């Protein structure tokens, strides 16, 4: 594309082959012949004096190829970022970035954050890509987003983690469901923390087996020797779990951050529709919340300022 900061064609072809693990698919994407792709790889291997791919029986990156892939991928991200910044200047745009975040946390975090951020940076354009942390990690490595709000993000040498806070799981249960299983005198006692063993007969909505939150809940239940005997529903969407709880159908275990909207619900609803929120005793599996960006890309002032505002607003919300 005209105006791009160009990367050597050999490296572009190498990236395609490394990602497709197929000369024919790489050729199709590059609109060249398979022989042309082969020639580019051969020239690059000769230049570096090493094999970048092995074929036994399928094409794979060698150790040298993996090192080169990481380096060239970062070069591509830096190149694209520089091109984007230059275009913004020439087009008169003050700046833009793309952030990854989960749907549930976007609803809780963004209204307050963007209200304050807009006061200082009214001309910055922000796009939001909504998905789970594992997907957002890949999008960042591929250069498709600039940063993301991660929950227990994996440790990767290309990631820079900016710690925000630790979130903890809380039990939520409607007043109507609570009264079916507990006496009024239990309410005051539970406000300081509940033992999940006392809720073994209460119906719960739980998370999918593959979900990260399901894993830490299972670890706690296993360690404490607890079994929930009534789990009619499984869904990883916390918003749905909260709505089922509000309806009095099931209880749920959700991060404290995502239960914050229930406080507003409790202030506005009738007393019989209140939802109780309890901390869980001995639940030693915090959710580490970070803002994550690519270590190799220098962040402009307006993104660093966004980090600071997110941190300040989260601390206000959680206290």
Regions found by a protein language model. Give the residues of each.
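Alpha-helical linker/hinge and terminal dimerization helices associated
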Residues: 11, 47-48, 68-90, 306
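Beta-alpha-beta core module
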Residues: 156-163, 167, 197, 239-296
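Hydrophobic hinge/microswitch elements
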Residues: 132, 141-144, 151, 212-275
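Secondary-structure junction motif
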Residues: 179-181, 187-224, 256, 299-308, ...
């Amino acid at each position: 594309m005209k105006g791009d900061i160009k990367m050597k064609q050999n490296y572009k072809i190498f990236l395609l082959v490394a990602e497709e693990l197929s000369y024919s698919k790489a050729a199709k994407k590059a609109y060249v012949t398979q022989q042309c792709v082969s020639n580019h790889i051969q020239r690059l291997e000769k230049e570096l004096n090493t094999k970048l791919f092995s074929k036994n029986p399928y094409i794979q990156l060698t150790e040298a190829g993996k090192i080169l892939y990481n380096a060239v991928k970062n070069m591509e991200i830096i190149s694209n970022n520089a091109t984007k910044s230059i275009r913004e200047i020439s087009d008169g745009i003050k700046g833009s970035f793309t952030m990854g975040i989960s749907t549930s946390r976007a609803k809780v975090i963004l209204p307050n954050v963007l209200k304050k951020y807009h006061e200082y940076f009214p001309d910055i354009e922000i796009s939001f890509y909504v998905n789970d942390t594992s997907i957002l990690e890949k999008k960042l490595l591929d250069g498709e987003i600039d940063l993301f709000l991660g929950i227990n993000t994996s440790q990767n040498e290309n990631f820079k983690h900016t710690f925000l806070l630790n979130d903890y799981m809380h039990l939520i249960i409607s007043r109507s469901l609570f009264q079916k299983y507990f006496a009024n005198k239990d309410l005051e006692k539970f406000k300081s923390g509940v033992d999940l063993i006392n809720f073994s007969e209460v119906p719960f909505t739980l998370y999918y087996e593959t979900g990260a939150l399901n894993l830490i809940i299972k670890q706690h239940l296993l360690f404490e020797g607890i079994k929930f005997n009534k789990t009619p529903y499984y869904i990883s969407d916390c918003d749905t779990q909260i709505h089922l709880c509000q309806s009095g159908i099931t209880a749920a275990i959700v991060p404290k951050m995502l239960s914050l909207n229930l406080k507003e619900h409790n202030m506005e609803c009738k007393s019989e529709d209140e939802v109780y929120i309890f901390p869980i005793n001995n639940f030693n599996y915090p959710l580490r919340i970070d803002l994550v960006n690519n270590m190799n890309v220098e962040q402009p002032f307006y993104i660093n300022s966004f980090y600071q505002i997110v941190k300040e607003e989260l601390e206000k919300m959680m206290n």
